Amino acid sequence: MKLVIAEKPSVAQSLAAVIGATARKDGYLEGNGWRVSWCVGHLAGLADADSYDPKYAKWRYDDLPILPEHWQMVVGKDKKKQFDVLKKLINAPDVTEVVNACDAGREGELIFRSVYELAGCQKPMKRLWISSMEDSAIREGFANLRPGVDYDGLRDAALCRAKADWLVGINATRLFSVLYHRTLNIGRVMSPTLALIVQREAEIDTFKQVPFYTVALELPGLTVSGERMADKAAAEQLKEACQGAAATIKKVECKEKSEKPPALYDLTTLQRDANRLLGFTAQQTLDYLQSLYEKKLCTYPRTDSRYLTGDMADSLPVLVNLVANAMPFRKGIAITCDPQTVINDKKVTDHHAVIPTRNLKDADLSALPAGEKAVLELVALRLLCAVAQPHIYSETVVIATCAGRKFTAKGKTVKHPGWKALEDAYRAKMKDAEPKKEGAEKALPELTEGQILSVAAAIVNEGKSSPPQHFTEDTLLSAMETAGKEDMPEDAERKGLGTPATRAGILEKLVSAGFLERKKSRKTVQLLPSHDAVSLITVLPEQLQSPLLTAEWEYRLGEIERGQLAPEEFLDGISTMLKDLVGTYQVIKGTEYLFTPPREVVGKCPRCGGEVAELQKGFFCQNDSCRFAIWKNNKWWAAKKKQPTKAVVSALLNDGRVRVIGLYSEKTGKTYDATVVLEDDGQYANFKLEFDQRKGGSR
């Protein structure tokens, strides 16, 4: 009997169906010589600090740094039941071999190995390594199970990553929390990511716009523009000199150019496009893609490759054809397939690029949740574009002179749309599709060198230098991928912050910790640092906020994975850094009030007329002699399964009432809408409901 352990129940069921383990048992499936069970994510993890010594339960400066000599793994209390099932199955006398079928990546390896080792197992171990949940891929994977020891490097890298996160998180968080008298969560990758955002905001705040001027000349059939000028008076003078004069065509240059199709998606580039085009967060895109993977409609999500392997070349045209037939936006567009544009064995390590599967042919795409369908269409579009013909166009550059100054114009004529026909068709169906800029692809009239044209009008256009842009998830993911180095060549070996598999989770942790705020601005959602984020980066030393140093650590984890670096050497470096940090760091003078956020006033106090501001536990009058308060855990609101928000309290203070939707009735168990009225008796803030008045906006 062979035991297969998957990462989650849904995957276990898919595997079991293919290998014939169809009989349901308590916590596993069985049949055809196989037992198939599952983890529920990480069943075990590194023990807390107080497991090594009870004194570590309290945070004290004198105990730092905490550096375990012998690491302990413990099973989570809420995961013990499933661990016990797996332990019993692993150690069953009739089980001769254990197959690791957890996700084919660093974390999947650690999930399985933790269970395998805590169960005390020494039985032969094999690895199922697949990039698709299609039945054919599963059958092929089981026919070619690999020796488990081949992935010892992957396990070592995953465990070192977990230990490094533990060491930095435990020691740095305790050190700075004790020194600055408040909880400051610090992470090995979180903090340098936050530093990128804080640095960008500082650049925006200190940016000074500089005006510039250009002179444009209206000629028959085209407009030519001069170079930027810093002096407005000089621009006006040039305008006057050109007005009514003649311009001479000095040069006409026409070149045929070709724009290659884009590469296929890896996880990060898909997350970036899904954020830019669809407004999805990185985590949402990963969740949608993971679901599509488990539904056998897309290949493995957590990949860092943008290419396919040579053995996929022959079957690719069939896949491209069925994907094209399933996508409504490609109607009327001829589909071509050049497999060689996406095949590169040297650029595929663990998993190939994200592509749709052949199961798309029989799938009811209309039944998919909207988010999954949108991501699937994006993945399908990229496959069709990547194997399509190049976009070919001719570009004409005209240089003219007038009043002794040079003016230029560019024109573009599309010769063959190639892959861009698909992209244009996809964008045209989007609700928020941006209209094409006028003149962006406008052809220029036939001109000859030496030709003289009259100037119909001369205009001075004023512009201003642009500040750096606020980060969006699209641009932040790009910065994380290159550790903030904007000029890194595409083919350079990446030393980034985190991995494709972890970046989405890092962003979500920063948001949930209150360090980042998502703020919508027009069609984009910006990532803005909070007051606490700026304060934290102000006091953190370079080694904890340097993107380049953290990226170097990530690169060394890759070396461990490849067997090029001993885990002990990596962890010794982390420990040495922490010893130095604890021994040398001193509180920065003048930062006593750094972590006291400015209090936002939400309204006037109904008792004394003072200002009411939001604090952590509620909304309080800032007049020291006044006791007015609306607590966030107010029992009246809690009974209705609501919490007074800033918008609700502001309306109550300013209007005395607010319309609230979705209030819960303890009597009926249903929800209802009503107007909440504030009644203050001088001692307590009370509330009552009105059902016949609808004053105030809904909240």
Model-predicted segments: where are they?
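Amphipathic alpha-helical transducer elements in NTP-driven molecular machines
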Residues: 9-16, 33-36, 40, 76-87, ...
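Metal- or metallocofactor-binding catalytic centers and their adjacent structured scaffolds
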Residues: 233-265, 271
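Conserved short loop/turn motifs at secondary-structure junctions
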Residues: 1-3, 101-104, 181-183, 254-263, ...
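C-terminal or mid-to-C-terminal helical accessory/interaction module adjacent to the motor/catalytic core
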Residues: 93, 135-219, 254-258
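Secretory-pathway/luminal and periplasmic proteins that interact with or process carbohydrate-rich
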Residues: 295-301
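Basic, low-complexity terminal or inter-domain segments flanking catalytic cores
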Residues: 2-3, 79, 90, 118, ...
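Intrinsically disordered, low-complexity regulatory segments
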Residues: 1-162, 166, 430, 467
